[in-house]
Structure formats: C-alpha cells, structure tokens
Amino acid sequence: KLVMVDNEWNIFSAYRAVYGIGYPELASLEQAAEHGPGLVDTLFFPGCSLVSYAPELTRTVGRWLTDNGVAWALSTDCCGSPLMSAGLFDRAAALRQRILDQIRAAGIVRVVTVCPGCGEEFVELMGDEVDIVPLPELLLKKSRAAERAGRPTGFAPLPERSVTFFDSCHD
C-alpha cells in the first residue's frame, strides 16, 4: 500500500515525515498554482527519490537555480511511475492530471527533471505545451553561457563533446 504514491501517505511522504524532511522555505507547486501565473515559470521536479532521500542535494540544486536567475517552484510529488508499474493506470493518470493542472494554473513553461523516468513520463504527458529539461542539460547550458561571459563555473576547459551520464533510475 505504501507504493500508492497518489495517497497523501506513501513510502516517500512517510520517510520524509519520519526523518523531518521538508521544504517549507521553498515555493511549492501548490503555492505557485494558487498564486497563478507570474510567480514562477519553472518547476523543479527532482523525483520522489531525490526529494526524499537527498534533501541537501535538492536544496543545492534549488540554490543553483536561484543563483542562475531561474524563478522556480518545487514539487515533492512522484510522477506516478510506481502506479503504472503496478498496473494502476487510472490512478497514475489522475495523479499526472493533478500535477498538469497545477502546472497550467501556475503558468509554468519549463519543468526541470532529475530522474530520466520522470522526464519521459512528463514528455509523454505535456511535452507539447511545457519544455521538459533534464537537469544535466540545464547545468551544461547555463555553465557554458557563464563561461562565455567570463564567469568561471568549474566546467572549463571541457571541450564540446559527448559524455556519458549515469543515473541509477529504473529506466
């Protein structure tokens, strides 16, 4: 039952509650949706694992987004992949629709994902109306622009070439 990520209490929300993991200092997708367009234009969707098990990394990415001029909100939701894996397609669709409705209400035009599985789910759901950007691509793009402007980022002097990025997700 804890894998039912569309429930208020699930494996990830329970873990965050037990270990006191929360993000009250950050704008949430729910707050952005209630506010309406203009508060943020980007949603940071770290995925259920990162947002639950790596709160400092989640906050570090958030600081990086802010430092790079991104107006963003955080989602602590799961993309619904566990529901899909369990064959609960209607529940997964309802969860995704709720997230999409909030994205639309907030006027969000870009979703930054960490988990490639979440990225794939969102491209399928809303790729025609929202730009879905994997975090590594955004890091590289923003860092290259900063380097060209004379602001060192630690990425130089990497040449333009293909690199391998390993993630441990299920995809």
PLM regions and their residue ranges:
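Iron-sulfur-cluster electron-transfer modules
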Residues: K1-V130, K142-A146, G150
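A cross-domain feature marking catalytic cores of carbohydrate-active enzymes
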Residues: P46, P136, D167
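Short glycine-enriched loops at secondary-structure junctions
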Residues: P116-G117, L138, R161
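Short, acidic/turn-prone active-site loops that include or flank metal/cofactor-
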Residues: P134-K141
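Redox cofactor-anchoring modules in respiratory/redox and cofactor-processing assemblies
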Residues: E147-D171
